[in-house]
């Protein structure tokens, strides 16, 4: 459970995320989505009970353990004032084939022709030279190429058109090694069927 002074956010909350599973957390504004994300990311500690990671209390782990395995993609993606390539690779040594695969799976590959200098295009300060959708896709490509095993997306495709959102959704849902946690204020019934489990925040939740 978790409470702020004078306000209970979660009580008897029980969620189970298995390796390789695809999960959706759905709730309206004020349902506790942001608080839950901060708990999952280790930014908050539960007042009662615990967040377990590999069956161990998450609080015992070094924060780098999470950052090495987890990627958090939010609506307002942060980019460095450098090239598109550097924002994806973060200076890592990757082959052109690995970069292309990440670009295709993040629906960014076709946009290269729109960039003045392709991958070497300057993204600008915090990516201001790119659209919101392009920034989100760069964040997805970054997570994929760095082999992050847990991907948390907080409305992470909100700036994308339906076609590109579907490309990303398909690649992530079909990747068996990625544990996907999608956070959304709404999910259509036909979309829910694609997920291992859908948790509705604001309701009594159990595993």
Regions found by a protein language model. Name each.
Residues 23-24, 72:
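Short beta-strand immediately N-terminal to the Walker A/P-loop
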Residues 50-52, 60, 85-125, 168-170:
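ABC ATPase nucleotide-binding domain helical subdomain, centered on the C-loop/LSGGQ "ABC signature"
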Residues 1-6, 51:
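Conserved beta1/A-loop at the N-terminus of ABC ATPase nucleotide-binding domains
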Residues 26-28:
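The feature captures the beta-strand-to-loop junction immediately N-terminal to the Walker
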């Amino acid at each position: 459970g978790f409470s702020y002074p004078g306000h209970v956010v979660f009580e008897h909350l029980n969620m189970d995320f298995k390796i390789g599973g695809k999960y959706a957390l759905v709730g309206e504004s004020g349902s506790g989505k942001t608080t839950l994300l901060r708990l999952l990311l280790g930014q908050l500690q539960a007042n009662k009970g615990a967040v377990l990671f590999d069956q161990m209390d998450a609080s015992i782990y070094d924060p780098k353990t999470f950052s090495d395995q987890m990627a958090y993609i939010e609506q307002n993606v942060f980019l460095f004032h450098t090239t598109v390539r550097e924002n994806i690779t973060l200076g890592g040594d990757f082959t052109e084939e690995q970069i292309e695969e990440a670009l295709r799976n993040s629906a960014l590959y076709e946009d290269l022709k729109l960039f003045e200098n392709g991958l070497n295009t300057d993204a600008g300060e915090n990516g201001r030279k790119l659209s919101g959708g392009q920034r989100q896709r760069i964040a997805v490509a970054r997570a994929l190429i760095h082999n992050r095993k847990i991907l948390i997306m907080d409305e992470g495709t909100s700036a994308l058109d339906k076609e590109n959102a579907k490309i990303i959704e398909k690649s992530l849902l079909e990747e068996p090694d990625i544990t996907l946690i999608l956070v959304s204020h709404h999910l259509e019934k036909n979309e829910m069927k694609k997920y291992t489990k859908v948790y509705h925040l604001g309701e009594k939740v159990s595993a």
